[in-house]
From Swiss-Prot:
A Pfam family that the UniProt record links to this protein: IPK
Positions contributing to substrate binding: P220, C221, V222, L223, D224, L225, K226, M227, G228
Lineage: Eukaryota, Metazoa, Chordata, Craniata, Vertebrata
Protein name per Swiss-Prot or TrEMBL: Inositol hexakisphosphate kinase 1
SUPFAM superfamilies recorded: SAICAR synthase-like
Species for this entry: Rattus norvegicus
Gene name as annotated: Ip6k1
Sequence ranges of Basic and acidic residues compositional bias: 150-160
Single GO molecular function: inositol hexakisphosphate kinase activity
Top-level taxonomic group: Eukaryota
Phosphoserine: residues bearing it: S151
Catalytic activity: 1D-myo-inositol hexakisphosphate + ATP = 5-diphospho-1D-myo-inositol 1,2,3,4,6-pentakisphosphate + ADP; 1-diphospho-1D-myo-inositol 2,3,4,5,6-pentakisphosphate + ATP + H(+) = 1,5-bis(diphospho)-1D-myo-inositol 2,3,4,6-tetrakisphosphate + ADP
Any single Gene Ontology cellular-component annotation: nucleus
Length: 433
């Protein structure tokens, strides 16, 4: 289906999916909760997304103090369609070679990377992490209708062990329980349709390799927040700028500098992920935003009060870093807040509920595990949380790519959003002590 040079991709981990001896079969990243570009799983520790030159350059130019708050940039791969023996078309990644003719998402920007990337970034690595639920394969059937630009038929060959359930606009549960975040599937279908409609000449596509920031979490609860009071880049057309400004004015982006773009939260009482998408987030009032944040921190049994300080500490640290980044603008960037939905304390709490016991033990320490028969917890330890900035396709700073517009001072719209997010979380913490 496409012509690629025969190259050795490298050592495959035990969780790798191979496409012949040369390529890596890309799988859907089932924990994608927002965005419009499809994220694909490359291996346990790595995801990939369609390359946009500005975003690639931005990752290569990140200030060192921002790297704690962004996914690690791992390089570039070439991606193309390939057919299998069952008549399905899959996305397969190959090592990127600079001499290849490759397509990327930002049509006006076709320049090649300024440097070659180490082969380390092209090796498919495995791990011993508990991510069996992420092993899914996305493909679509070839048929007479496959030349149409409508959404392809998608078949997921394996699924998450934890069902996902979308919340409707009335805050009620949908009847459908599926094995992947519904927004993830939507993005995959749209991405495949775009690529298929552009693939008449069997072109290769460039994809960025990035750290999978949820790979540390067994049951990742993810909140995707669109940050800032402005979303359009300096190079946006007047029409697009007006459209983005309307979205901001009609949402909490204008009033708070932040709006919900997507969410999944694990519910201990049902064993499901509850999901929200960007359309829900756009319609929220300030009070609605507060309620959404409360819902994100609630596991179906309790408000996770133990999460307040770890998350607030991360947010304050990020705010301090961004206040020092003069001329930087992160238009249309998102912020991911992540925690584990089934840590030791949570499982002990569920045991107490099942046994009718009133007290919840303190946080678990190294000496305690959910499998212990005793319900006594060891020394307390803070829960694992993470905060990461993503999506830099419209970011800029002084001297970046000779951008004609240069801004003064830090990104005040982004910082404004962080200040309000911190304030709302502090109020919620104080009200629920």
């Amino acid at each position: 289906m496409c012509v690629c040079q025969t190259m050795e991709v490298g050592q495959y981990g035990k969780n790798a999916s191979r496409a012949g001896d040369r390529g890596v079969l890309l799988e859907p990243f089932i924990h994608q909760v927002g965005g419009h570009s499809s994220m694909m799983r490359y291996d346990d520790h790595t995801v990939c997304k369609p390359l946009i030159s500005r975003e690639q350059r931005f990752y290569e130019s990140l200030p060192p103090e921002m790297k704690e708050f962004t996914p690690e940039y791992k390089g570039v791969v070439s991606v193309c369609f390939e057919g299998d023996s069952d008549g399905y078309i899959n996305l397969v990644a190959y090592p990127y070679v600079e001499s290849e003719t490759v397509e990327q998402d930002d049509t006006p920007e076709r320049e090649q990377p300024r440097r070659k990337h180490s082969r380390r970034s092209l090796h498919r690595s495995g791990s011993g992490s508990d991510h069996k639920e992420e092993k899914a394969s996305l493909s679509f059937e070839t048929s007479e209708s496959s030349q149409e630009t409508k959404s392809p038929k998608v078949e997921l060959h394996s699924h998450s062990d934890v069902p996902f359930q979308m919340l409707d606009s009335n805050s009620g549960l949908s009847s459908e329980k599926i094995s992947y975040n519904p927004w993830s599937l939507r993005c995959h279908k749209q991405q495949l349709s775009r690529m298929r409609s552009e693939s008449k000449d069997r072109k290769l596509y460039k994809f960025l390799l990035l750290e999978n920031v949820v790979h540390h979490f067994k049951y990742p609860c993810v909140l995707d927040l669109k940050m800032g009071t402005r979303q359009h880049g300096d190079d946006a057309s007047a029409e697009k700028a007006a459209r983005q400004m309307r979205k901001c004015e009609q949402s909490t982006s204008a009033s708070l500098g932040v709006r919900v773009c997507g969410m999944q939260v694990y519910q201990l009482d049902t064993g499901h992920y509850l999901c929200r998408n960007k359309y829900y987030g756009r319609g929220l009032s300030i009070e609605g935003f507060r309620n959404a944040l409360y819902q994100y921190l609630h596991n179906g049994l309790d408000l996770r009060r133990d999460l307040f300080e770890p998350i607030l500490s991360k947010l304050r640290g990020l705010k301090a870093v961004l206040e020092r980044q003069a001329s930087y603008r992160f238009y249309s960037s998102s912020l991911l807040v992540i925690y584990d939905g089934k840590e030791c304390r949570s499982e002990l709490r569920l045991k107490h509920v099942d046994m009718g016991l009133p007290e919840v033990p303190p946080l678990c320490g190294p000496s305690t595990s959910p499998s212990n028969t005793s319900l006594e917890a060891g020394p307390s330890s803070p829960p694992k949380v993470d905060v990461r900035m993503i999506d830099f396709a419209h970011s800029t700073f002084k001297g970046f790519r000779d951008d004609p517009t240069v801004h003064d001072g830090p990104d005040r719209g982004y910082v404004f959003g962080l200040e309000n997010l911190i304030s709302i979380m502090e109020q919620m913490r104080d009200e629920n002590q």
